[in-house]
Amino acid sequence: MSIWNDIWELFFPRYCVVCSRRLLRGEAHLCLSCLNKMPRTGMHLQVDNAMEKNLWGKFTLGKATAFLHYAKDNDVQKILYALKYYGDSDLGIFLGRLMATELQPSGFFQGIDYIVPVPLHERKKRKRGYNQSEMLASGLAGVTGIPVFKHLIVRDQYTETQTRKGRFERWMNVQDV
């Protein structure tokens, strides 16, 4: 790190998005402790895993996984809120790279031709400044070399926020979008 980076860090220190501890050199977005405590699912190692079963019959699917366990008020929620609502687009790239780095040794990405991020309505994209799904896809692509096709799917209907909806309500909210 250069002297300029040290000076920058002095005036603009970086903090962990989970525990708010000041980040050390070499840490990005998450401190090492929070990074190691992130609840990984291990689904990518399971044939016909819970994520795949949840999506069966809804659309044609090769494979699916969830990288982290999400629960209300857990650390993953804090990370996703920082990504979606606090303007931390680089966090999405970081998470995509982390996911790809951890899943790639298992062969999970073999046979995958493209990464297609979930589209965001233009109104939400303007408000947020970016599509968090595109940021994750960019991070995945950076490690795997798999190309990202951002414009393969288009969202033409605006939907209200789903943060206070149950699973069924969420599913119904995005029908025909």
Regions flagged by a language model, labelled:
Residues 1-177:
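Glycine-rich phosphate/pyrophosphate-handling loop used in enzymes and phosphotransfer proteins
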